Amino acid sequence: MLTQDEVSAQLGQYMLRGYTLLDTICPKCEKVPMMRLRDNPMFCVSCINDLKESDASEHVTVAESAPKIASLPISKTNDAERSQQTTKAPVMERTESSHQATLSVYSRLISELESQLDDRLPLPHNTEFLDVSLQRIERILNLISLAKSLMSS
C-alpha cells in the first residue's frame, strides 16, 4: 500500500499526463479518488500498485485496464487546442466587459465635465473672474475631447 505522499505524487503525475481526477472515491481502499483518461475506464492509483505487487486475480479487469491507459499516447495538440478553446472565451468576455466598463467610466466623466461646463455658463461680467472661468472652460473642453478620443480608440 502506498503512503499518502506517494499517492499524492502519483495523482499529480497522472494529472500532468492529461488524466482527470474524478470525484468518485475508490470502492476498494475508500481513500483515493479515481482517475480516468478521456473515455477509458476509471482506476485507482493506489489499488493498481497493490494489484501489480500481489497479482491478485480477482481484480484482473482493473489491472488490465491500467496498462492500456498508461500506454495510450498523449495528444499534446488536442490538449493544447482544448486549453486554448477554454481560455479564449473567458479572456474575450473579460476584455469585452472591461472595455464596456471603461466606456462607462468615460461616459460618466464626459457627463460630469459637461455639467461643470454648464455651471460655468453664463460667463461672469467681472474681468478677473472671466479669465479664471475661461481657463476652466478650456480645461474642461480639453478633458472632454480627450475622453471622447479615448472612447473611440
UniProtKB/Swiss-Prot annotation:
Q: Where in the cell is it found?
A: Cytoplasm; Nucleus
- Region of interest (Disordered), ranges: 72-98
Keywords attached to this Swiss-Prot or TrEMBL record, sorted alphabetically, are: Cytoplasm, Nucleus
Main localization, broad class? cytoplasm
- Presence of the UniProt keyword Cytoplasm in the record: yes
Question: What's an example GO cellular component term for this entry?
Answer: nucleus
Q: What domain of life does the UniProt record list for this protein's source?
A: Eukaryota
The record's InterPro entries line, in alphabetical order, gives: SSSCA1, UPF0148_domain
PANTHER family referenced in this protein's UniProt entry, alphabetically: PROTEIN ZNRD2, SJOEGREN SYNDROME/SCLERODERMA AUTOANTIGEN 1
What is the protein's given name? Uncharacterized protein C3B8.8
Q: Species name for this entry?
A: Schizosaccharomyces pombe (strain 972 / ATCC 24843) (Fission yeast)
Q: What is the lineage of its organism?
A: Eukaryota, Fungi, Dikarya, Ascomycota, Taphrinomycotina
